[in-house]
Amino acid sequence: MWGVVDDSAEEPWHELWGLFRPDGDVSWQHKALCAQTDPEAFFPEKGGSTRDAKRVCAKCEVREQCLKWAIDHDERFGIWGGMSERERRRYKREHRERA
């Protein structure tokens, strides 16, 4: 049947994943500058430049929350909080050794 679409059934999925919830642990994402930028810059092909993404991150007011989220969730792809996956691994290792 064609007609009005009931989107209310999708809302539980948003809550499940913590999306679009002001009280969720990703509430900072709506302030992220990367949300206004080409996402491909943050997920470059192997060997591709990360410079543009890191430049955006450097100006972003939620960079620290973004980096913490990526580290806490073991994010393995892309630039998060101004760091590549390799840089995040090194950061985690260095901070673990200091603790």
Curated annotation (Swiss-Prot):
GO biological process assignments: cell redox homeostasis; negative regulation of DNA-templated transcription
One Gene Ontology cellular component annotation held by this UniProt entry: cytoplasm
Chain residues that bind [4Fe-4S] cluster: 34, 57, 60, 66
Coiled-coil annotated residue ranges, if any: none
Induction (UniProt): Constitutively expressed during all growth phases. Repressed by osmotic stress, not responsive to a number of other stimuli.
SS bond partners: none
Cited Pfam families: Whib
Processing after translation: The Fe-S cluster can be nitrosylated by nitric oxide (NO). Upon Fe-S cluster removal intramolecular disulfide bonds are formed.
Cofactor note: Binds 1 [4Fe-4S] cluster per subunit. Following nitrosylation of the [4Fe-4S] cluster binds 1 [4Fe-8(NO)] cluster per subunit.
Protein family (similarity comment): Belongs to the WhiB family.
Cited function: Acts as a transcriptional regulator. Probably redox-responsive. The apo- but not holo-form probably binds DNA.
Entry-linked PANTHER family: TRANSCRIPTIONAL REGULATOR WHIB, TRANSCRIPTIONAL REGULATOR WHID-RELATED
Designated name of the protein: Transcriptional regulator WhiB2
Lineage: Bacteria, Bacillati, Actinomycetota, Actinomycetes, Bifidobacteriales
Gene name linked to the record: whiB2
